[in-house]
């Protein structure tokens, strides 16, 4: 399933994120804020349990998340800022890291780092990466998680291309995709058009 998060706040911040005049500091803040907002939709069906708490005036019944069962796995490096934004909402979630870069010649992902919680196979995992372009990095990261026994995976990005969505759905049809926008297409270099450029470079001021 593909879920487009079209909340007005998300779309407002996404428009500013796309603007080429947005500086790295503001770009990081916007990406973090959008990720926090998108997490509301991603966690809509998380299980809760009923509890009682004592207020200053009596006993109230309430519900709490069992978010100890959640893990956030950013694809390095651009996914880090998304994970930080989500952790502001769910600070008790565990975090893993998968390092992938896209070979500029083949456009295929190359793995260079993986560090995951020991109990990752018992957790619902949210994989985050700002851009779903060719789909190669997302497919590779999810494949790594599945080899570790993870069964419940969601993928969250800010901008996606139709080609990337199709590739990810074909490789991992059991994984729901959450995105703030589906753009027009990929160019010959594998970049999303109109997109926002290279998310990692814009985040960290590199070229």
Swiss-Prot record:
**Which terms in the Gene Ontology molecular function aspect does this entry carry?**
GTP binding; magnesium ion binding; uracil phosphoribosyltransferase activity
Q: Which GO terms describe its cellular component?
A: cytoplasm
CDD domains hit by this protein:
PRTases_typeI (cd06223)
Give the residues the record marks as binding uracil: 192, 197-199
EC number(s) recorded for this UniProt protein: 2.4.2.9
Chain's role = Catalyzes the conversion of uracil and 5-phospho-alpha-D-ribose 1-diphosphate (PRPP) to UMP and diphosphate.
Q: Which family does it belong to?
A: Belongs to the UPRTase family.
User: How is this protein named in the record?
Assistant: Uracil phosphoribosyltransferase
Q: Which organism was this protein described from?
A: Dictyoglomus turgidum (strain DSM 6724 / Z-1310)
Q: What gene is this protein a product of?
A: upp
